[in-house]
């Protein structure tokens, strides 16, 4: 079976693992998935990210994070730009997720960055996902 949107699959694996309170979620690796996982780690949504090389494309292990009483750190993940409907924004139209409480992941000409970094560097791009 051909996967038409591997980024949506990656985000769905994280979302489903978070809902079931899994400690680790695994997904096939790619460059953009690695960058998204590193942003999730840098923003404090996940504990750690690990890359496992195999003879194929490799695997990304995302270690999910929960609060002291088991509450979820990630409330929701939403894919915005899809293969059938791409969503692009200019540097002055970059959205704020939940008035700044969430994070938008944007693919720019300088790489995959958060909405805050894109605003600071004054670059626009494709809105990949919202996380809050």
Curated annotation (Swiss-Prot):
A Pfam family = Ribosomal_S8
Keyword set, alphabetical order: Ribonucleoprotein, Ribosomal protein, RNA-binding, rRNA-binding
**According to the lineage, what is the superkingdom?**
Bacteria
Q: Which Gene Ontology BP annotations are present?
A: translation
The record's annotation in PROSITE patterns points to: RIBOSOMAL_S8
Q: Assembly and interactions?
A: Part of the 30S ribosomal subunit. Contacts proteins S5 and S12.
UniProt protein name: Small ribosomal subunit protein uS8
Q: Which gene encodes it?
A: rpsH
């Amino acid at each position: 079976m051909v996967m038409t949107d591997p980024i949506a699959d990656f985000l769905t694996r994280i979302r489903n693992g978070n809902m079931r309170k899994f400690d680790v979620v695994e997904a096939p690796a790619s460059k953009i998935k690695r960058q998204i996982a590193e942003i999730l780690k840098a923003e404090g949504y996940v504990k750690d990210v690990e890359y496992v090389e195999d003879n194929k494309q490799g695997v990304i292990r995302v270690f999910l994070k929960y609060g002291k009483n088991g509450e979820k750190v990630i409330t929701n993940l939403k894919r915005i730009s899809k293969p059938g409907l791409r969503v692009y924004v200019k540097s002055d139209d970059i959205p704020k997720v939940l008035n700044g409480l969430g994070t938008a992941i944007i693919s720019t000409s300088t790489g995959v960055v958060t909405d805050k970094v894109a605003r600071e560097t004054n670059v626009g791009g494709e809105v990949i996902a919202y996380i809050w």
